[in-house]
Amino acid sequence: MKKSIFFLAASAIMFAMGSCTNDVLDNVQQVDSSLPQTRATASNDWTYAYVLSEGTWHVAPPSSPGNIVRYDNNWTKKSTLEIGDTGNDLIQYGSKLYCAVSGHDLTADNGGIWVLNAKTGQLLTPQMKQYDDEKTGHKAMPRHLAAANGKVYISFYSGAVMSIDTMNYAKVNYLELDATYSEGICIGKDNKVYVCNSGNTDDTQAGEGTTISVLPLTLD
């Protein structure tokens, strides 16, 4: 299970990410008791924290859905939003939060994007926004997010990238990559889009890839 945490302050945003897997937890043999067993923030001068929980992915039994939990600065839970199968990324851009939900697999048609008001945590999209992935002929399986120039860029697990408008969340541009299992995405200081591909074109399993796609912001 993976969790991402946002701390919202009046003047700044701090982002922390942690992750764990059942494999890691199952193989823990002992705990060093000399190390602190709790984690604390340096101060409580932030307003809200948003915690993205990936959920649990299973072939069988069915996966447990992911969620976004909103806490106040006393770590009192204020709200929980169930987001679906495999919440994978959460970013803030401007006054909004964007959450990528991958869905179960490339043909499950249950992945998409949620948009929330960063200040209130209220949904700005009454339903998860879903996008067609021309490479698979199915609904897209979003993995990670980046933002620049009024657009949010989304990497698709099929090996494609899409940009959407931050006003109406409509598709702006789409590009199929010569790769599969695209994962991390960022915007460089050179105003280019960088995408890490964990599979190459003919790979049948994620993790076999060694390529990074470098693209213009126009994705052409």
Regions found by a protein language model. Name each.
Residues 51, 99-100, 154, 195:
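Residue position within the beta-strands of beta-propeller blades
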Residues 75-82, 122-136, 170-176, 220:
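A short beta-strand motif characteristic of beta-propeller blades
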Residues 66-69, 111-114, 160-163, 210-213:
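A short loop-to-beta-strand structural motif that recurs across blades of beta-propeller domains
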Residues 171-220:
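Solenoidal tandem-repeat scaffolds enriched in leucines and small polar residues
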